[in-house]
């Protein structure tokens, strides 16, 4: 049986990347929350 997690960097960035987060209001909320919390890495793009 094929597992559910099939790693793919392009898909990862397009779904969870910084520009993807900036596109929606809720995505911008996520970034604001992570900034407020002091996360070193805001999105997967920051690796």
Swiss-Prot record:
Known role:
Binds the 23S rRNA.
One GO BP annotation here?
translation
InterPro entries per the UniProt record, alphabetical: Ribosomal_bL34, Ribosomal_bL34_CS
Give all cystine bridges in this chain.
none
Q: Which organism is it from?
A: Deinococcus radiodurans (strain ATCC 13939 / DSM 20539 / JCM 16871 / CCUG 27074 / LMG 4051 / NBRC 15346 / NCIMB 9279 / VKM B-1422 / R1)
Does the keyword rRNA-binding feature in the UniProt annotation?
A: yes
User: Is Transmembrane included in the keywords of this UniProt record?
Assistant: no
Recorded family membership: Belongs to the bacterial ribosomal protein bL34 family.
Keywords recorded for this protein, A-Z: Ribonucleoprotein, Ribosomal protein, RNA-binding, rRNA-binding
The family database entries (PANTHER family) matched by this protein are listed as:
LARGE RIBOSOMAL SUBUNIT PROTEIN BL34M, MITOCHONDRIAL RIBOSOMAL PROTEIN 34 FAMILY MEMBER
Which is one Gene Ontology cellular component term of this protein?
Answer: ribonucleoprotein complex
**Molecular function as annotated in GO:** rRNA binding; structural constituent of ribosome
Its subunit composition reads: Part of the 50S ribosomal subunit. Contacts protein L4.
Q: What is this protein called?
A: Large ribosomal subunit protein bL34
């Amino acid at each position: 049986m094929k597992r559910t997690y099939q790693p793919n960097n392009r898909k990862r960035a397009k779904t969870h990347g910084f520009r993807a987060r900036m596109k929606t209001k809720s995505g911008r909320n996520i970034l604001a929350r992570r900034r407020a919390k002091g996360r070193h890495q805001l999105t997967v793009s920051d690796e």
